[in-house]
Regions:
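Charged catalytic and DNA/RNA-contacting regions of genome-maintenance
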Residues: 1-251, 255
Length: 256
C-alpha cells in the first residue's frame, strides 16, 4: 500500500481509481464513496488486522460506465494506471495518475451531455462586486463578467456551471450569495490576484495586453479568468490550445 498511499497523498481530494491487474480499485473513504455512488460491493482488505481497510473495485473495461457516474455525483476522480507491462516489471509495477476529472472539467463523451455546455466557474468575491469566469473545456468557450451579485447570479442560473472555483477566504460569502448546491473547489488567496491572473492570460493567449479581450477595465473578471487557467494547470489539463479567447460580457444578460 506504500505506492498507493504516496499517490493518494498527492491527490487527497479525489477518488483515486488505482489500477491493479484488470481492475480499478478504491480504498478507505474512496471505497465507501464509490460503493455508494456506483452500487458496487464494499469489502475489506486485511479483515481483522491492524491494516484493515475498505475496498471496492470494478473491471478496467467498465471505466467509461463508472467514471461518468462518479463525476456526475459531484466527485473529483484521479485515474491511476499501470505505466508498464506487469510482465516486464522488475519489482513493483510503476503507476501514475494519467487523468484528473472534475465535475466542471471533462472532455469524455460519456460524461458530457449532448448540446449542453459543461462549464467550470471561477468566482472572485469582493465587497464592491463579483468577478466571474466560465470555461467549457470540451469546446474552448471562455467567458468572463463582473458586476453586482444580482447580475452574476443571473448568469450562474442561466449557464448552470458544474463546478465552482473559490478563494478559500471568501467561500462563506459566495455560499451566502449564490447557495451551496454546486460542487466547489477552494484555491489559495494568491491565485486570486490581478498580477498572477495577467501572467496566466498572457501565457495562454500569447499577448502582453488585455485590450483584445476587453479585460483592461475589468479587474475582477480578469482575476476570475486567471484562476480558471491556473486550475487547468493545477490538475494537469495542459491541452488548452483550443481556448483561443475570452469573451467579456458587458450587458446585463449573458445572452444579449
Amino acid at each position: 500500500m506504500k505506492q498507493y498511499n504516496r499517490i493518494k497523498a498527492k491527490h487527497p481530494d479525489t477518488v483515486l481509481l488505482f489500477r491493479v491487474g484488470d481492475f480499478y480499485e478504491t480504498f478507505g473513504s474512496d471505497a465507501i464513496a464509490a460503493a455508494k455512488v456506483l452500487d458496487i460491493v464494499l469489502t475489506k482488505r486485511g479483515n481483522g488486522s491492524a491494516s484493515e481497510i475498505e475496498l471496492a473495485g470494478f473491471p478496467h473495461h467498465s471505466l467509461d460506465t463508472y467514471l461518468p457516474k462518479l463525476v456526475k455525483s459531484g466527485l473529483k476522480v484521479a485515474v491511476c494506471d499501470q505505466l508498464e507491462d506487469p510482465k516486464q516489471a522488475k519489482g513493483l509495477v510503476k503507476r501514475g495518475v494519467t487523468e484528473l476529472v472534475t465535475p466542471g472539467l471533462v472532455t469524455h463523451d460519456h460524461v458530457l451531455e449532448s448540446k449542453v455546455n459543461h462549464f467550470v466557474a471561477s468566482l472572485h468575491w469582493t465587497p464592491k462586486g463579483v468577478g466571474l469566469a466560465l470555461l467549457d473545456l470540451s469546446t474552448g468557450e471562455f467567458q468572463a463578467a463582473e458586476g453586482d451579485a444580482r447580475w452574476i447570479d443571473r448568469i450562474l442560473r442561466s449557464l448552470e456551471p458544474k463546478e465552482w472555483l473559490l478563494d478559500r477566504r471568501h467561500e462563506g460569502d459566495v455560499r451566502a450569495l449564490f447557495g451551496d448546491d454546486v460542487p466547489r473547489t477552494t484555491l489559495e488567496d494568491w491565485v486570486f490576484t490581478k498580477a498572477y491572473a495577467e501572467e496566466w492570460i498572457a501565457k495562454q493567449f500569447g499577448t502582453g495586453t488585455l485590450k483584445g479581450f476587453g479585460l483592461e477595465d475589468a479587474p475582477l473578471a480578469t482575476i476570475a479568468a486567471g484562476a480558471v487557467l491556473h486550475y487547468l494547470d493545477f490538475i494537469h489539463h495542459r491541452e488548452t490550445t483550443h481556448i483561443q479567447g475570452c469573451l467579456l460580457y458587458t450587458s446585463p444578460s449573458p445572452r444579449d
